[in-house]
Amino acid sequence: MKDGLLRSLIYLATALTVSILFIIIGFILYKGVPGISVDFLTRSWDDKTTFVNVKADAGRTGEGDEGYIPALGITVKEGDKNLVISKIEKNSPAKKAVNMKNVSYVLKKDDTISKIGSDNTEDLSFKDAVKLLQSSNGTLRLKVTRPGGGIIPMFVSTIYIILLSLVVAGPIGISAAIYLNEYAKPGRVLNSIRFAIQNLAGIPSIIYGLFGMLLFVQTLKMQYSILAGSLTLSILLLPTIISTTEEALKEIPRSYREGSYGLGATKLQTIAKIILPGALPGILVAVILSIGRIVGESAALIFTAGTIAQIPEGLVGGKASAATLTTKMYWLIKESGDLSAASSIAVVLLVLIILLNVASKMITRAFLKRTGNG
């Protein structure tokens, strides 16, 4: 009777857990998948307005729709007060446009033209604006706005922060775990260190964010930057990496160490050739857990990396501030309540985590085969 009741409770708890998981994922997919498109994945988040120079080719001829501009190799349509590029020919001069710094700025479909020379398109009728473009010769200056709504800046920033955080926290955490398991003498000091590590794992991430802001952003003058955010996350990840790696090292049988010493290997050689390769699957778990923590973190990054949707142009400084996918999700819900866009970002996050985990396992498997441990 008691066994049957206990078994029923276990089944009920399992079914409830799995159901909640499927409901959450199903809701995210239902709300998010319709909003995912090529533009969503490849565009910048904010609209970008630029003045460009385009050299019209008067020798180009042809017929097309009402908004066809032969000299530029484009077709425009009427937008909201402006012209919208609807088609671009393969060899269009518009693909050779340059900005005011004489840097290539290829015009694309859906770009909006709001100014032709000194004339604002909103002050012209559609026909007059098209005639103005068709009658233009030589170099033509256009004010072009590229529509946003894409996640590419946040996606790139997320990858940068994942890599930087793991590069810093990985070696430090693994080295600390090796010391605690292989070198440190059992006693009060070791127990105190492990107790401190366990307590660090339980500190709210917003506390790490405040610490990172005070130390990296203000004291070390890094400003809001991906380096400040990555260093803050590195500190946050250390307890997870140390604890998980140490548990993996403990799983290596004592006989492996003794056999290596018996063959004349030093302790360092034993660690490098025997213990670490054997513990690699467990270390991989630490890396996967760390990736999940980084991708899901927002509080610490808001205080250190900032919330600007841009691709960082350095590690520190004004142009190094960047929002990750998670921080952008937070601001979307907070500022505009756009649940659909936030869900679309969540779908991308799920796919990103899966791909990174698969890549980690493939790299580990290849390493184990190469070293003869697979």
What are these model-predicted stretches?
Residues A56-K115, D119-E122:
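PDZ/PDZ-like domain segments forming the peptide/carboxylate-binding groove
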Residues K108, S114-K115, L124-P147:
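PDZ-domain C-terminal substructure recognizer with occasional recognition of PDZ-binding tails
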Residues I302-L350:
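Interhelical loop and adjacent transmembrane-helix boundary motif
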Residues S165-I197, K361-A366:
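Transmembrane-helix boundary motif in ABC transporter permease subunits
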Residues Q198-L233:
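Generic hydrophobic transmembrane alpha-helix motif, especially the helices
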Residues T244, K267-A305:
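Transmembrane alpha-helices
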Residues E246-K250, R254, I288, Y330-G374:
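C-terminal transmembrane helix and the adjacent membrane-cytosol boundary/short C-terminal tail
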